[in-house]
Amino acid sequence: MTAQIRLAEPADLNDDTLRARAVAAARGDQRFDVLITGGTLVDVVTGELRPADIGIVGALIASVHEPASRRDAAQVIDAGGAYVSPGLIDTHMHIESSMITPAAYAAAVVARGVTTIVWDPHEFGNVHGVDGVRWAAKAIENLPLRAILLAPSCVPSAPGLERGGADFDAAILADLLSWPEIGGIAEIMNMRGVIERDPRMSGIVQAGLAAEKLVCGHARGLKNADLNAFMAAGVSSDHELVSGEDLMAKLRAGLTIELRGSHDHLLPEFVAALNTLGHLPQTVTLCTDDVFPDDLLQGGGLDDVVRRLVRYGLKPEWALRAATLNAAQRLGRSDLGLIAAGRRADIVVFEDLNGFSARHVLASGRAVAEGGRMLVDIPTCDTTVLKGSMKLPLRMANDFLVKSQGAKVRLATIDRPRFTQWGETEADVKDGFVVPPEGATMISVTHRHGMAEPTTKTGFLTGWGRWNGAFATTVSHDSHNLTVFGGNAGDMALAANAVIGTGGGMAVASEGKVTAILPLPLSGLVSDAPLEEVARAFEDLREAVGKVVEWQPPYLVFKACFGATLACNIGPHQTDMGIADVLTGKVMESPVIEVLG
């Protein structure tokens, strides 16, 4: 049974006066407020494309009727033969990944046809705790974009293996779940904790079940008994798919799938698997998860996921159904996801079913965008609470080196950028510090939230190419500590101090110079600058990092830098405490295994 999200908003459609007006307009006894004519309706129930006109009263669809049979309306929108679809619903995403404010994000996606997002603000939660989630709830007020918040379940994502800016237990989750803006528990990344009935994670899941709200998952690599156990605990969705086979296994298991666009190289495999079925399961929804600012500016949000899926061979009707009706059913929102009398008038008119360029966008019956431009003002929110998150002093070059006795050591290494595994190598020691092994990349993490001493912990990566500079970032999932990658300690200190000096963000240094910087003074995650400005700076960063290391797609890519500290994933990961391994639950404070001489 679909969890029913207890939100206040759907009640606005139950106003007796509104319903009376809608009934009268549907009968022809009074005119519509808005009439969309001349369009081809995308029927996400039957899969048909059929001519139809849509009459709207207030926020409510009053009538879907024969073309040109009515002309009585205060406002007429001529669709001109274009395709009329329900507004797109993004079932799992993080606004912070686009490095802009919710207001700027709304301006970017609403004009493209996205009318609802399900936002997990766990980046703000990991930096600011409950205050960060409270700010997110305030920031979405009165936006033309409907944002359903989820309560961050993993703050931090790997307790005991990393330290962030807060620690959410079941009591805090229960309080968050009582807020009307909160639609459920966000992706549960501590999979082992759920499966092994860790009291903390069991309590968090139970808080979601008791609130009768969604309990969303992060089931990377789970299968067979572990997957069943994860679901039996109460988790009902997943977006962490790694192959077409994984997709099919999780569909058969009964999970709701949030098919994400952030791993483009996997989408053709997913499309092939769905096409083999011959129908679209009702449990397939779509999400963006993470979209970088330059990608958002150039490609868009969920509209880009729909566009790419169709390009890879998915039927447009299927892609739209996944992004509308299936999503609404997942959310328990019977007012959304369908163009039918009695439903909410969240509507987008697409030019065609290939490029999915939005000609008109209506949100709750109000025209909010036309021709890719917003028609309404978007309110902003005070950001004072998000400032001042860099609670650490400037770094010295020696802070990034590993101390050791002797002349030679055996080191533990973190091998491969994805699906990491333990490795070993030998290295020389000079002046009390380990000399980085040939071909290894240093990764250093420094706690920045004031919850522990800001001691830098350094490890060694293999398979990351040869670095002739450094990249520093405070966007480092999920605790968002100061993380620096590099080939030498001098450039690492330079990049780190540039980031500290701007109150958080990203910087690249090479040969003793800072070559690119993106200030993110809000939480060390977000800028209050316009999307266009942030996107340009991020593009410059991509280019600058590409000059200090040679990427090897699909796994050794710029994006890998932001997930290298994700300690909840299987395998060794560097954190502010050392090299952490979620399977053993242990942290290796120094990579030095043994002094050899």
UniProtKB/Swiss-Prot annotation:
Q: Which GO terms describe its biological process?
A: adenine catabolic process
Task: Name the Gene3D superfamilies on file.
Answer: Metal-dependent hydrolases, Urease, subunit C, domain 1
What are the EC numbers?
A: 3.5.4.2
Top-rank lineage group of the source organism: Bacteria
Instruction: Give start-end ranges for the coiled-coil region(s).
Output: none
Q: Which InterPro entries match?
A: Adenine_deam (IPR006679), Adenine_deam_C (IPR026912), Amidohydro-rel (IPR006680), Metal-dep_hydrolase_composite (IPR011059), Metal_Hydrolase (IPR032466)
- Catalytic activity annotation: adenine + H2O + H(+) = hypoxanthine + NH4(+)
EC class, as a word, reads: hydrolase
**Entry keyword set:** Hydrolase, Manganese
Q: Does the keyword Manganese apply?
A: yes
Annotated Pfam families? Adenine_deam_C (PF13382), Amidohydro_1 (PF01979)
Q: Any idea which GO molecular function terms this record carries?
A: adenine deaminase activity
Needed co-factor(s): Mn(2+)
Q: Which family does it belong to?
A: Belongs to the metallo-dependent hydrolases superfamily. Adenine deaminase family.
Q: Report the protein name in the record.
A: Adenine deaminase 2
- Tell me the organism: Agrobacterium fabrum (strain C58 / ATCC 33970) (Agrobacterium tumefaciens (strain C58))
* Protein encoded by which gene: ade2
